[in-house]
Regions:
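A generic structural signal for alpha->beta connector loops
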Residues: 15-18, 44, 69, 89-90, ...
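Hydrophobic alpha-helical segments within soluble ligand-binding/sensing domains
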Residues: 1-4, 30-32, 78-81, 96-114
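Short beta-strand elements at the ligand-binding edges of bilobed clamshell
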Residues: 21, 87-99
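Ligand-binding cleft/hinge of the Venus flytrap
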Residues: 3-16
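Conserved active-site and cofactor/substrate-binding residues in soluble primary-metabolism enzymes
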Residues: 1, 48, 54, 100-104, ...
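Hydrophobic alpha-helical
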Residues: 6, 20, 24-83
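Structural detector of well-ordered beta-strand residues that form the stable sheet scaffold
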Residues: 49, 71-73, 91-94, 129
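Hinge/cleft segment of the Venus flytrap/periplasmic-binding protein
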Residues: 9, 97-143
Length: 143
């Protein structure tokens, strides 16, 4: 869903395109190797988006090793990711809300077993954590 979401947003910006999609198998080492490979194949690449909790950190490792700069975007709020956002190595991370996810799941299950209609898909909010240090609401919670 994360890649699908990115594609749906990028479609609104004709000046932007996704150069390539790689998999890291949720491995920081693989994310670093894939980022180095991407930057070799696409030297003008401006940004890298990591979709697993470790991908952003792996991409950061790669740009540091290559002594280059790129815009890096991540998911989730591992302590090291939050520090990388604070220090400017990662521009932004999208943070899930696990308590909301769990309570929504329980409420939907309750409704389902009560015979009520439940949606096929239910989205929960996310927070955007950037270098300002404040988590901004996004998704359905955005103003």
């Amino acid at each position: 869903l994360r890649l699908e979401g990115l594609r749906s947003i990028i479609a609104n910006y004709p000046e932007m395109k996704i150069a390539d999609v790689r998999t890291s198998d949720i491995s920081r080492l693989q994310a670093s190797e894939q980022t180095r490979s991407l930057l070799a194949a696409y030297p003008d690449l401006k940004a890298v988006v990591g979709f697993s909790a470790l991908d952003g950190l792996g991409a950061l490792d790669a740009v540091r090793q290559l002594k280059t700069q790129r815009l890096l975007f991540a998911f989730d709020d591992l302590d090291e990711t939050k520090e990388a956002v604070r220090s400017g190595g990662i521009q932004l991370t999208l943070v899930q809300q696990p308590l909301e996810m769990g309570s929504t799941a329980i409420a939907l299950l309750h409704d389902y077993f009560q015979g009520k209609s439940v949606p096929d898909v239910s989205y929960t909010s996310i927070r955007l954590l950037d270098g300002s240090g404040s988590a901004q609401p996004a998704g359905e919670d955005a103003p």
